[in-house]
């Protein structure tokens, strides 16, 4: 049975950025992706925001994100992704292992 939703993974810089700003940027990215008209399906953003991950180190976050990337129909990279180490790794995983498409939010 085909999934009735388009599962979107959003990759974005998070280090040193407040949760509020991260959520704001994700919403902007979601709206941008919707405006592309890529799919007629309902868009489900994969929840990779790990707010309460006490004791996690950078590679813990990254390993969780890599697992979630495997479930994506598409991956959206938000502005300045190329300045964040984790996003660079996510890009390589998306490029070589995700069956969906890769989208880039334009820089302003």
Where are these regions (language model features)?
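Conserved catalytic or regulatory cores that recognize and/or transform ribose-phosphate-containing ligands
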Residues: 1-108
């Amino acid at each position: 049975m085909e999934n009735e939703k388009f599962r979107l993974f959003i990759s974005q810089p998070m280090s040193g950025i407040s949760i509020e700003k991260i959520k704001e940027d994700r919403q902007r990215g979601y709206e941008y992706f919707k405006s592309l008209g890529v799919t007629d399906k309902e868009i489900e953003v994969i929840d990779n925001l790990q707010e309460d991950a006490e004791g996690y180190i950078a590679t813990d976050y990254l390993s969780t994100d890599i697992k979630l990337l495997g479930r994506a129909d598409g991956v959206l990279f938000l502005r300045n992704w190329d300045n964040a180490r984790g996003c660079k790794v996510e890009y390589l995983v998306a490029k070589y292992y995700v069956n969906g498409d890769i989208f880039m939010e334009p820089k302003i």
